[in-house]
A protein has these predicted regions:
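Bacterial Sec-dependent N-terminal signal peptides
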Residues: 1-23
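Phosphate-group recognition and catalysis centered on beta-loop-alpha active-site segments
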Residues: 20-260
Length: 260
């Protein structure tokens, strides 16, 4: 088990170290469900990460930013799980028929961990060919953010479910395997708002955080980051793995014309 874990970490570190090119796979669709075409706009732009907020209400999982915005037709299954299933069938078990690439679905739990996470895993288990990498190597990666269980409870959930990490949290080796990503609030580390250069001291602090996360074979994104071209350039310079955006076409076009 230890050898297998070490091999996985080495492989991920190697991938991170060699992935110098930024593409749309480095793009994250923030609050994707608020787009005019939830899921499809980011998917068609070949985004590597898509975010959905969920609420558990009366045994169903609804997608919304606020509870007051819940509507009967906007369930996780209708907006994301079923469309993904249709595409995987069309593409013979892959996200995109002409590519081996896949993406992650970052699911933000807005209601309490339980029963929300159990309801979610029950729904995901209906689609093992979509989300379980032991069944399909091209599976969509599920990462849980928002309300999360204590790391000691990670093991209580299916192995295909990963969790958003926090740099202030300590994880043992078995828990770290279940950390699929680190997400941090950029405002906690810098007052920079995307227009001017980052102060050198704050840039060094960010680089240290990013390098530390990469050093354990994980990826990182910053939420609450300025959503501008100037900001995107700085985030690429810092080697942030996923660039947050609410502006899918603009970031997709930017990444095509500003590859590093």
């Amino acid at each position: 088990m230890q050898k297998k874990l070490l091999s996985i970490l080495v492989l991920i570190c190697t991938t991170l170290a060699t992935n110098a090119q930024y593409t749309s796979l480095n793009a994250h669709s923030h609050n994707d469900y608020e787009q005019k075409q939830p899921f499809y706009l980011a998917y068609n732009a070949h985004f590597g990460s898509i975010e959905a907020d969920i609420w558990a209400v009366d045994g169903e999982l609804y997608v919304a930013h606020n509870k007051s915005e819940i509507s009967a037709e906007r369930t996780l299954e209708m907006l994301y799980l079923k469309p993904i299933s249709v595409l995987y069938k069309q593409n013979k078990g892959k996200a995109w028929g002409d590519s081996p690439d896949t993406f992650q679905l970052l699911i933000d739990l807005k209601t309490a961990v339980e029963p929300t996470l159990t309801l979610l895993t029950e729904k995901l288990k209906k689609y093992p060919e979509l989300f379980d990498p032991s069944i399909n190597k091209n599976a969509v990666r599920i990462v849980i953010t928002g309300n999360r269980p204590n790391p000691s409870k990670f093991k209580d959930y299916p192995g295909f479910v990963f969790f958003d990490g926090n740099i202030s949290q300590k994880y043992d080796a078995s828990q770290l395997v279940r950390v699929g990503l680190y997400s941090e609030n950029l405002a906690n580390f810098t007052k920079w708002r995307g227009m001017e250069s980052i102060p050198e001291k704050e840039e060094l602090r960010l680089r240290h955080i990013i390098d530390s996360v990469h050093g354990i074979g994980k990826r990182i994104r910053f939420w609450n980051a300025p959503d501008t071209e100037a900001s995107w350039k700085i985030l690429m310079k810092l080697k942030v793995d996923f660039i947050n955006t609410d502006h899918i076409p603009e970031l997709a076009n930017f990444l095509k014309t500003n590859q590093q």
